[in-house]
Amino acid sequence: MGKQINIESSATHHQDNIVSVITATISSSSVVTSSSDSWSTSKRSLVQDNDSGGKRRKSNVSDDNKNPTSYRGVRMRSWGKWVSEIREPRKKSRIWLGTYPTAEMAARAHDVAALAIKGNSGFLNFPELSGLLPRPVSCSPKDIQAAATKAAEATTWHKPVIDKKLADELSHSELLSTAQSSTSSSFVFSSDTSETSSTDKESNEETVFDLPDLFTDGLMNPNDAFCLCNGTFTWQLYGEEDVGFRFEEPFNWQND
């Protein structure tokens, strides 16, 4: 009986030891698992931080350069200079437009070449400057390169118009000259008209005074009342009190 109790107690004690060992094993595995999970989490966070840092650095670089590669016909050299070129129409070759310190200068050079080769249908980096860019003498690559260099090196842009004050002065002088010419024309016309009128008047007077003499002997009618004295009549001047002349009619007794 005593032996049986000892065996049962020892078995129970052995089971307790096994349970303790199993519990300790489970606890240690849980610790290992948790530490492994924490390490994995730390690693993932570190990788994410590195990735986000790289993205931030890339975005900062893009912001600093203001995306210069968006200019058409412009690319950057490894040493920091910017080159400009354009493809010739219906050819695989390109026209070299030069190397410039900034992307904007290279872009203006490209715009000049695009206008020369493609006209108004060409794609421009600065369409607002299309009317101010220099034009090449011809469409040869040499002339295009010269005009492109001139546009790239230009620092200021002015519209090719006359100053407003000068334009007003020119307009005023043109108006004055027009008015003077109109006045001169009117004066010449009036002078010609006056001369024509005086000439017509003189010719009319000559016509009046060139009438045939109605009192000549050949044209006078003997039966006319003015011919009572054989075609003769007399005028008698009276004193100063009389106003004019008096016509002295002949008497019949004078013809006896």
From Swiss-Prot:
CDD domains: AP2
Entry's Gene Ontology cellular component terms: nucleus
Stretch list, region Disordered: 33-72, 186-205
Keyword match Membrane: no
Localization annotation: Nucleus
Transmembrane annotation, as ranges: none
Main location (coarse class): nucleus
GO molecular function: DNA-binding transcription factor activity; transcription cis-regulatory region binding
DNA-binding region boundaries: 70-127
Sequence similarity: Belongs to the AP2/ERF transcription factor family. ERF subfamily.
PANTHER family noted in UniProt: ETHYLENE-RESPONSIVE TRANSCRIPTION FACTOR ERF035 (PTHR31985:SF300), ETHYLENE-RESPONSIVE TRANSCRIPTION FACTOR ERF042-RELATED (PTHR31985)
Function: Probably acts as a transcriptional activator. Binds to the GCC-box pathogenesis-related promoter element. May be involved in the regulation of gene expression by stress factors and by components of stress signal transduction pathways.
UniProt-recorded name of the protein: Ethylene-responsive transcription factor ERF035
Species: Arabidopsis thaliana
